[in-house]
A protein has these predicted regions:
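Charge-rich, low-complexity N-terminal segments
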Residues: 2-53, 178
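Short, surface-exposed recognition loops or helix-turn segments adjacent to catalytic cores
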Residues: 37, 105-107, 145-159
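A short acidic-to-branched-hydrophobic micro-motif
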Residues: 56-78
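Short, internal acidic amphipathic alpha-helical interface segments
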Residues: 72-112
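Ampiphathic alpha-helical segments that act as solvent-exposed interaction surfaces
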Residues: 87-99, 119-151
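Short, aliphatic-rich beta-strand segments
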Residues: 113-118
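Acidic, Ser/Thr-rich low-complexity intrinsically disordered segments
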Residues: 154-204
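Short Lys/Arg-enriched helix C-cap and helix-to-coil transition segments
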Residues: 205-211
Length: 211
């Protein structure tokens, strides 16, 4: 299912294609969030966007009137003690009062903490979408600090990088290509990239050409 919307200029827009182009056409050479290169999967009714530098998965839905960005935190509250949940909800409400555009909500049977923002499809352009993405990421990092979850999300980021390296090895990437990925995409220095790659390949007993 493809959603076509008439934008402010009166032309038809396939938002899946347009947003995917915005997220994948960067160069990873600037600080601008819209210059980051995202891995985007098109699930027809929504997009899934991931970046090795970001410990969150983004889900981007579109309808005839709005584009919705949802950031999944993976933090479920359904099984927590009532006082714990009350404290979390209070902190989320206080965070919502500090931020514009984006809002934290509880979603699903697991009562997961997610962040969402709705954008008017009729007037949306790349700059507004980029501002919304920046707002989402800023709000998420505010939550991490508020809940003191730095270690948890650093581990998630490390796990994501390890998984990406394993996927690239399975696809036949060379050691040089893996090092280039760690240095240019992740932003590591050469020595750190080599140490991490050695650790990954030794742990999972890959072939000698990766070591």
């Amino acid at each position: 299912m493809f959603i076509y919307v008439i934008n402010g200029e009166g032309s038809m827009v396939n938002w899946n294609d347009e947003i995917k182009k915005w997220l994948t056409s960067g160069t990873d050479t600037k600080e601008d969030i819209m210059d980051m290169v995202w891995n985007v999967k098109d699930e027809k009714t929504y997009l899934i966007a991931e970046n090795p530098k970001i410990p969150f998965t983004l889900y981007i839905y579109n309808s005839e009137k709005f584009i919705r960005i949802i950031a999944s935190t993976g933090l479920n509250t359904a099984l927590l003690e009532p006082l714990q949940r009350l404290d979390i909800y209070r902190k989320l409400l206080l965070l919502n009062d500090k931020i514009d555009m984006t809002k934290f909500v509880i979603s699903g049977t697991n009562e997961e903490i997610i962040l969402k923002v709705d954008l008017d499809a009729a007037s949306l352009d790349k700059n507004e979408f980029g501002d919304a993405l920046m707002g989402v990421l800023t709000s998420l990092y505010m939550m991490i600090r508020e809940f003191q979850l730095e270690d948890e999300f650093n581990k998630r980021l490390t796990d994501r990088i390890v998984n990406m390296i394993q996927e690239k090895i399975a696809e036949g990437a060379t050691r040089e290509e893996l090092l280039e990925f760690l240095v240019k995409k992740i932003g590591l220095d050469q020595k750190t990239a080599e140490n991490i790659l050695n650790e990954i390949t030794n742990k999972f007993e890959y072939l000698p050409e990766y070591q």
